[in-house]
Amino acid sequence: MVVKVGINGFGRIGRLVIRNALEAQGVEVVAVNDPFIPLDYMVYMFKFDSVHGRYKGTVEAKDGKLIIAGKPIAVFGERDPASIPWGASGADYVVESTGVFTTIDKASAHLKGGAKKVIISAPSADAPMYVCGVNLDAYDPRRPSISNASCTTNCLAPLAKVIHDKFGIVEGLMSTIHATTATQKTVDGPSNKDWRGGRSVNNNIIPSSTGAAKAVGKVIPSLNGKLTGLSFRVPTLDVSVVDLVVRLEKEATYDEIKAAVKEAVAGPLKGILDYTEDALVSTDFTGNTHSSIFDASAGIALNKNFVKLIAWYDNEWGYSRRVVDLITFVAQKDGNA
């Protein structure tokens, strides 16, 4: 059975969730809401993409609907989530991808329009967070609004799980070298809450805060309080990399760590975590559907208890694929697929 989905917010993640749903199948987007983007502009934005290239299928506007690959998608322009007629369009699940309605209270407004469940494509202060391959066994169908966590948490958590399960993590620090996102400034501008964040992304490396490492403690409770981290925003369009430094409980050679990751890649984390020994750079991972790609040739060990591990992720494409995967999973558990 196909899961019918609505998208609130036709930004980077909203559009790429649709592209991934078309690729992965099993999920059909039947409605889109965005009060700031008219239908003809939606066609243009979906067709052309500076990172992932031109959409190879057909996309057009017809009779007030967005037609992608021959399938009609209802289009709404409501500012209030409670006013979006999801039920009338057949959408059971809603992807909240505006980055605005990220709490349970705000996201749950979608239920008033007929949605059965909301998946927030961002970290949430109070909604339960789920990371595919890590804590889906903790899924509670009774919760109407859930979070897919952040792209960085989706990269870090699977790797941290493998290392923690096999060797134990005493403590760790993470840095993410993160590609540009839509909220950053092209030229220096005002940013009262984050002064450095107001500086031009085009010619700067910008230190920034991130809750991604701490959030791992929410999806892997035994790591709660053991990880924290920061971010450096860099002037690239897509693909980011996690640099994880950990102290291990059990001694392990770097070869033993590589073997543990390989085992997980071939087993329980297949499709989520990947492994490479090739001498790759960031653009080589554009369009990669994995949450995390362990770079075996980039990591180093100081000794058998202290190691630096490197993992890449397409913070747009890989994350959007996990949104689709999470929808598929919860629909099955909810009995709607």
Swiss-Prot record:
Catalytic residues as annotated in Swiss-Prot or TrEMBL: 151 (nucleophile)
EC number of this enzyme: 1.2.1.12
Molecular function GO labels: glyceraldehyde-3-phosphate dehydrogenase (NAD+) (phosphorylating) activity; NAD binding; NADP binding
Keywords recorded for this protein, A-Z: Cytoplasm, Glycolysis, NAD, Oxidoreductase
**Gene3D superfamilies in UniProt:** Dihydrodipicolinate Reductase, domain 2, NAD(P)-binding Rossmann-like Domain
* Entry-linked SUPFAM superfamilies: Glyceraldehyde-3-phosphate dehydrogenase-like, C-terminal domain (SSF55347), NAD(P)-binding Rossmann-fold domains (SSF51735)
Look up the record and report any one GO term of the cellular component aspect.
cytosol
In terms of one coarse class, where is the protein primarily found?
Answer: cytoplasm
Is Cytoplasm there in the keyword field?
A: yes
BP GO terms, sorted: glucose metabolic process; glycolytic process
Per UniProt, where does D-glyceraldehyde 3-phosphate bind? Answer: 150-152, 181, 210-211, 233
PROSITE patterns attached to this UniProt entry = GAPDH
The cross-references to Pfam families, in alphabetical order and at most eight, read: Gp_dh_C (PF02800), Gp_dh_N (PF00044)
Q: Where in the cell is it found?
A: Cytoplasm
What pathway, per the record?
Answer: Carbohydrate degradation; glycolysis; pyruvate from D-glyceraldehyde 3-phosphate: step 1/5
SMART domains membership: Gp_dh_N
> Can you tell me which residues bind NAD(+)?
12-13, 34, 79, 315
- Keyword set includes NAD: yes
Marked site positions, Activates thiol group during catalysis: 178
Q: Which reaction does it catalyse?
A: D-glyceraldehyde 3-phosphate + phosphate + NAD(+) = (2R)-3-phospho-glyceroyl phosphate + NADH + H(+)
Instruction: Specify the domain of life of the species encoding this protein.
Output: Eukaryota
Cross-referenced InterPro entries, in alphabetical order?
A: GlycerAld/Erythrose_P_DH, GlycerAld_3-P_DH_AS, GlycerAld_3-P_DH_cat, GlycerAld_3-P_DH_NAD(P)-bd, Glyceraldehyde-3-P_DH_1, NAD(P)-bd_dom_sf
Please give the subunit comment from the record: Homotetramer.
Which family does the UniProt entry place this protein in?
Belongs to the glyceraldehyde-3-phosphate dehydrogenase family.
Q: What is this protein called?
A: Glyceraldehyde-3-phosphate dehydrogenase
